[in-house]
Amino acid sequence: MNVQLPIKDAIGAIPTGERPGSRKVYQAGSLFPDIRVPFREVAVHPSANEPPVTIYDPSGPYTDPHAKIDIEQGLERSREPWIIARGDCELVATPREVKPEDNGFAQGKHLAPQFTAKRPIFKGAQGKLVTQLEYARAGIVTAEMEYVAIRENLRREQDRPCVRDGEDFGASIPDFVTPEFVRQEVARGRAIIPANINHGELEPMAIGRNFLVKINANIGNSAVLSTVADEVDKLVWATRWGADTVMDLSTGRNIHNIRDWIIRNSPVPIGTVPIYQALEKVNGVAEDLNWEVFRDTLIEQAEQGVDYFTIHAGVRLPFIPLTAKRVTGIVSRGGSIMAKWCLAHHKENFLYERFEDICEIMRSYDVSFSLGDGLRPGSTADANDEAQFAELRTLGELTKVAWKHGVQVMIEGPGHVAMHKIKANMDEQLKHCHEAPFYTLGPLTTDIAPGYDHITSAIGAAMIGWFGTAMLCYVTPKEHLGLPDRDDVKTGVITYKLAAHAADLAKGHPGAAMWDDAISRARFEFRWEDQFNLGLDPETARAFHDETLPKEAHKTAHFCSMCGPKFCSMKISQEVREFAAGMAPNSIEQGMAEMSDKFREQGSEIYLKTE
């Protein structure tokens, strides 16, 4: 296990500052004037005579040059006043104390430093509304809902026309998102706003079929790698490149302390798989897990501010034999843990049996469910089998139970699925899970490319996002091979941002095409700097261009090294356009008529005889 250094020595330079060619801008609320919703604005060259392009921005204060970043104090808890003003929560008088097992019994130099800055810990007051779902059902528009509405509109005006030429497969995407529309979607369970009342640093966002497709990035330590510094750095790095949520999947020691540092410095929702930490508390012996340990872990993480829990309550005892003839069996870590527990005790999954108790704990802090697909296929050969869909149907049943308790729900999905089987996954989820948001890992469309699974999965992610999946969990090049580093995180995030945007474009999401059109015009007009800055990864685009044309003068040239100055199709197209524009209005028709007359004079023969 790594030696844990003091945070000031270990943290290094957290990536901060604006992205190239961009600036941080904010839009205030109308119902709640104090809210400030962030965007990334990219200005284009004055010759374009175009307004700046507004891009969705989950990077938080780290890209605001005026923000004071202090990792040891955490981000400003700007959402906390909204929670207090509602008057529906109370301070926890005696918060749960940190126990040795919370950090895997790490001691001395191996124990990660605690996050020591003090903060209040809240819990829902008895008989009061607590969750965004409960507020929505009561007809109350919260500050979080207006925040989401502003964010989704990307600063478009309500009466501004938009292009809607996609296929949305029955979704109900509006031309303009209002706070009332957000409320309605949350009330129906078609969207969630994952926002624990103890995550005051959060910038609210929505996950739902009728909103922009979101992406999640996974970080977390393991039994052999990573420190607090590594994980905070990966958090900031992932959000800088566009991660909308981050899951802390830590499985080694120091899980509690590392998670505290992550949440206190996170502007995006944080998700976890509580069974991982519960397993550490019983020394890694799945058979020793029990409700008391798991319940304690839920409360611990809820008080810290985790926004959504992956709970594998659908891995039921009767379903386990259905996996026996699979090529890759049970590949979900959480699913395999619960399957082992069920078989060892020959009992029903205690997460399933105690599900209503879990709901009551999560409701008290407004923690959302991410109902885990513990029986997801781990190979294309196993896709869409009875084990997978039996669990999915159970998750649909549990969704109704969670809604009854006022808890927000999304459903996790596969996995490894060949392209021709992807649509069936979306159809089955909509049918059995009552339109609760779908959250999928890819899916990977082929199993032949270790080291390139970010690509094999992005193919499936773009497709299932188009069909209706609300959030895509990224896959990095290290999938199946090792723990990703920061370069892998960047690659995974950017790959999935383009998959999500491709899905938005295909769905006909209003505003999606504006970004593409802006960069297309820049490309046609040889505005190289605009091309770089409007891209998902300006640094890489600029570096690739400069490998062969490094001089500054080349950034105004009307060609690149692919075609050179004589064969550039866009340059030739511009010349054709200019030539056509200079011709008399009837000259083209006149020329065509002359050629037609000549054709008839020659006997209207397609092939002329030669002497």
Curated annotation (Swiss-Prot):
Disulfide bonds: none annotated. Zn(2+) binds at H416, H480. Substrate binds at N218, M247, Y276, H312, S332, R333, G334, D373, G374, L375, R376, E412, Y439. [4Fe-4S] cluster binds at C560, C563, C568. Keywords: 4Fe-4S, Iron, Iron-sulfur, Lyase, Metal-binding, S-adenosyl-L-methionine, Thiamine biosynthesis, Zinc. GO terms for biological process: thiamine biosynthetic process; thiamine diphosphate biosynthetic process. Its EC number is 4.1.99.17. Pathway: Cofactor biosynthesis; thiamine diphosphate biosynthesis. One of its GO terms (cellular component) is cytosol. Binds 1 [4Fe-4S] cluster per subunit. The cluster is coordinated with 3 cysteines and an exchangeable S-adenosyl-L-methionine. It holds the Pfam family ThiC-associated. Signal peptide: none annotated. Its cofactor is [4Fe-4S] cluster. Transmembrane segments: none annotated. GO terms for molecular function: 4 iron, 4 sulfur cluster binding; carbon-carbon lyase activity; zinc ion binding. It catalyses: 5-amino-1-(5-phospho-beta-D-ribosyl)imidazole + S-adenosyl-L-methionine = 4-amino-2-methyl-5-(phosphooxymethyl)pyrimidine + CO + 5'-deoxyadenosine + formate + L-methionine + 3 H(+). The keyword Hydrolase does not apply. The keyword Ligase does not apply. Homodimer. PANTHER family: PHOSPHOMETHYLPYRIMIDINE SYNTHASE, CHLOROPLASTIC (PTHR30557:SF1), THIAMINE BIOSYNTHESIS PROTEIN THIC (PTHR30557). Catalyzes the synthesis of the hydroxymethylpyrimidine phosphate (HMP-P) moiety of thiamine from aminoimidazole ribotide (AIR) in a radical S-adenosyl-L-methionine (SAM)-dependent reaction. Belongs to the ThiC family. This is Phosphomethylpyrimidine synthase. It comes from Caulobacter sp. (strain K31). The gene is thiC.
